[in-house]
Amino acid sequence: RPPVTEVESQNYYHFHDNRVLPSHVDEALANSEGWWYKPDFIINDLNVQSAIGYPAHEEVVPLVAGTYAVRGYARGHGNKIIRCEVSLDDGKSWRLGSVTHEGQPTEYGKHWGWVWWSLEVPIAELLTTPEIICRAWDSSMNTQPNTFTWNVMGMMNNCCYRVKIHPRQTTDGRFALQFEHPTIAGPTVGGWMNRAEDVAAAAAVTVAPPPAPAGAKSFTMAEVETHTTMESAWFVVDGKVYDATPFLKDHPGGADSILLVAGIDATDEFNAIHSLKAKKQLLEYYIGELAEEGQEAAASDRATPGPAAAIGTAVPVA
């Protein structure tokens, strides 16, 4: 049964998540001036969202006569979506798409379902524009801004969705258009917001795993898998073994968030959601190398080694 209390939750994440702080407020200022605790900035209602589904990311469309059905989805988070629009000239003019509403509003008049929209666009026109842009409007006449406004949590950014268009020549010599979305789902790098040059620049400042020092201990995966408790919690990231045991009690989200990855290779989970700061902090937990498959762990002292000095939080969530 959910508990009923006289005051709002005092959980760490109630105050330090789901907030949209003013754009001049960075993490340091938010901490020093108590911005996290100002009730005006909590997210209760969500804003209008829309996106382009087709053309899909990296889809190639031959340059032929005819039209292409640009399609996507939108949601008003309770408010009815009344129109969806597409622009081929950076928002100078807009074309009205057809909107399909599935399902009925609730007894309270709320529209919680996604809607689907589409617009037939001449393929020849797609050749003359660098991108396709979409936006939606709800029944309160709210729409999406042209560009996003930075905030420290990166939340509620619902600016117009943009798909870039690149002329290409196919392997058989025909001309075509290839489409590029701003990003792609999951931890994989892709999309026009993560171009190769940006990735290379980011790689230059990425925290590299610590090199294996001479005589470093090595551990088999089977050994790591035995350390899954409050008394001993190990995990693997990028072939390195880390021990977060002393920090379980200090983690603001509780020990469970670390114990979920204890005893496993947490590379994907860790790298997908953690910041550069968190990756620097991770180095303090390093205790040895993961032995390659078929390789015996070092036969040296097997006493559980302790990590370096405490740094304030267990595997930090950023």
From Swiss-Prot:
Binding sites annotated in the UniProt record for heme: H251, H274
GO BP term (any one): nitrate assimilation
Necessary cofactors: FAD; heme; Mo-molybdopterin
The keyword Metal-binding belongs to this UniProt entry's keyword annotation: yes
MF annotations from Gene Ontology: heme binding; molybdenum ion binding; molybdopterin cofactor binding; nitrate reductase (NADH) activity; sulfite oxidase activity
Pfam families: Cyt-b5 (PF00173), Mo-co_dimer (PF03404)
Catalytic function, reaction form: nitrite + NAD(+) + H2O = nitrate + NADH + H(+)
Domain Cytochrome b5 heme-binding, chain residue ranges per copy: 216-291
Assembly and binders: Homodimer.
Purpose of the protein: Nitrate reductase is a key enzyme involved in the first step of nitrate assimilation in plants, fungi and bacteria.
Family: Belongs to the nitrate reductase family.
Name of the protein in question: Nitrate reductase [NADH]
Species assigned in the record: Chlorella vulgaris
Organism lineage: Eukaryota, Viridiplantae, Chlorophyta, core chlorophytes, Trebouxiophyceae
